[in-house]
A protein has these predicted regions:
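Collagenous Gly-X-Y triple-helix signature in extracellular proteins
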Residues: 2-151
């Protein structure tokens, strides 16, 4: 077991429960035989989805600054001694809000919720005072959805 989770067994944390790991607070959203889906309890940073224009794929999560940031967070966690296998790879379906599938399905160890996941878990997600990004691209080429923290 990872030293960062030695005091918390996620199987004992109920869905919607808050736990501390990696020096941060998280909420457990769900679990299955592979592991747990968790979400940061608070906003870690404020940033644009992408800094600058990408006319070919303006709302593509794979090319976003948000995912670069989260990749750096993962690197920091592992550099500080957290085993990489603590972060179980999971698939994110990048189907847009109109049903188009040109962005495909990607796999990450740390990522964003999709619009469907937000709809499924919104009752468990703590309220925050600022909007936050979702992985699901809009059907238009200009935007990605935001979740407004007030509900």
């Amino acid at each position: 077991m990872s030293k960062i989770l030695k005091s918390t067994t996620l199987g004992n944390v109920k869905n919607g429960g808050i736990f501390k790991a990696l020096g941060k607070e998280f909420v457990k959203l769900d679990a299955d035989e592979h592991g747990c889906l968790v979400l940061a309890k608070d906003i870690w940073t404020k940033m644009p989805f992408r800094d600058g224009d990408d006319p070919e794929c303006p709302n593509d999560l794979r090319r976003s600054d948000v995912m670069k940031y989260l990749g750096n967070c993962l690197a920091e966690f592992t550099e500080k001694g957290t085993p990489l296998d603590t972060f179980i790879p999971f698939k994110i379906d990048l189907q847009d809000t109109t049903g188009q599938t040109e962005y495909g399905i990607v796999e990450y160890r740390i990522g964003l919720l999709t619009l469907r996941q937000y709809g499924k878990y919104w009752r468990l997600i703590p309220k925050v005072d600022t909007p936050w990004w979702l992985a699901t691209p809009y059907g238009t080429p200009n935007c990605s959805p935001l979740a407004h923290g007030s509900g």
